[in-house]
Structures are given as structure tokens and as C-alpha cells.
Amino acid sequence: MPLAVDMHIPSPPVNGFHVGPLFVHFYGLMYVVGIALAIYITRRRWRAVGGDPSLLTDVATWAVPAGIIGGRIYFDITTPFDIVPKHAWYGPLAVWDGGLGIWGGILAGAAVGIWRVHRAGADWRLMADAVAPALLVAQAIGRVGNYFNQELFGKPTALPWGLEISRAARLGSGIPAADMKYTTFQPSFLYELIFDLALAAVLVWLGHHRNIRPPGLLALYVAGYSAYRIFEETIRIDSSAHFLGLRLNFFIACVGTAAGIAWFVFVQRRGKVPEPGRPASPVPGGVTEAAAAAEPSAAESNPAAS
């Protein structure tokens, strides 16, 4: 039975479109757009601290597939088999079936990315701070795909921004039987989209206006996003692995929040600054501090301008 609402967010009429014989899912398309935009943003931020853009291309070539596979493996491990049946041997690669766990994706992508940066002899901490806000933008765009898949919704609600979920999607999500009678639910994916963009803006501002030792921005990303997920896990009702009566990801989020805060404090108190000759921290305007100090003024470089 629908909750008494005068307004709500309607269910998506479609979840994809055809390009000739190929059916393109909006879910996958949003991930592609998010990844592409994240690479673009990171490239600009990496170049601003004096990094070689070609290194980012190499890192993305390795880290993006690793992140997708890591996210898929994490999803398969932490999602009950009544929702995700046991796959064939290629299950962890079957991203076309949907289902990616952010924690597994970040861990796998970060591990492979750090390996590639270290292999190139660059400072992975600077790369980490360059990519942190971009990750949040990519996650926000990916959440649009969750809307088209009618997933990642929360408890039933009578709020005017309640999301209408079709019966088929309700059945497929494994929500409690008592909630099947409702049709409008908390759009938790939308809450995360808004939070991700807000946190990305905060990280960019901090990087430009505060002396944050790298990888302090990445540590704040871990702490901030994990703290948000503590809230989200309390309103999500889709099927999930549980521990001590609570969703498993609730505990993962608690650990992530504590670890991120501890990491940030440690880095700011005892972390090393970039080595001499390495790119310095970015300043407003998209150049490094060293470059900004060395760049002559317009009047000095062009006497006619004075």
C-alpha cells in the first residue's frame, strides 16, 4: 500500500536504451561517465602539483579495472546468496550483472594505483590527494545509475522526496516482507550523491586554503565518507550480510571512520612533507607554490605594462 504522500520521486520509466543491437544500461553508462570525469579532474589536479600527466594515464589503466574487479568481489562476498546466486568461475568479472561494493573497489584500486606510482618513482601521497575529490565526484555520478536500477533505497517514507520503487524492484532487493506493501522509500542513493559532491568541494577548498600534509585529503575522504555510510547503513533495508544484528557495512564504516581520523592526525603531526625537487602543494590558480613564487609578474616580464 502506498504511503500517504502528495509528492514523490517517480520510478524511472526505463533503465537503458538501444544503440543498434546493443542495449546500453544507464547504470553502466553512469559508471563510465563518472570514471572519465574522475580521470579528467585528477589529471588537472596532478598537473597542478607538477605531476606528469602520462603517469596518471598509466595509473588509471591499471587501477580502474582493479577497482571494478575489487568492488565486484566485495559485493559477491558480502551479499547474501538469496540475492546474488553463486556465479560461475567468471562471477567476479561479471560486472554486467550489476553490483559493486565501494570498499572493495577503493582498496583494490588504491593498492594497484600506489604500486604503479611507486614503480614510476613518484610521490604516491601527492597522487592520493589529487584523486580524493575526484573519487567522490565519480561516486556521485555512479549513484545516478542506482536510481535507474531502483536500488540502494532506504526505509519506507511519507516525505515528499520519497522514491517510488516498482514491485519487481522491491522483490529483487530482498527487503523485509513487512515493507513490501509500501511503494515510496528513502532515496538513500540521492542523499549520498549530495554528500559526495559536498565533501568533494570541502576537500578541494582545504587543499587550496589549508596546509594539509599529503595524503591528508585522502585520509579525510576515508573518514568523511565512512562517517556518512554509518548514517546510510541505518536506513538501508535491502538485503545485506549482518553481524550482531546490524548490517556488516555498518561496522566497516565505523572502522573506516576511526581509521581515517587516526590516519589524518598521524599524517599532520608526523607525516613527511614532499621531498625537495618533488611537486609542492597546489595553490589557487592551478600552479604549484614553487612555480607561483618563481613566476615573474606581468609588469616585470612586460615593461610596457607598467
Annotate each PLM feature:
Residues 1-306:
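A feature for loop-to-transmembrane-helix boundaries and adjacent hydrophobic helices
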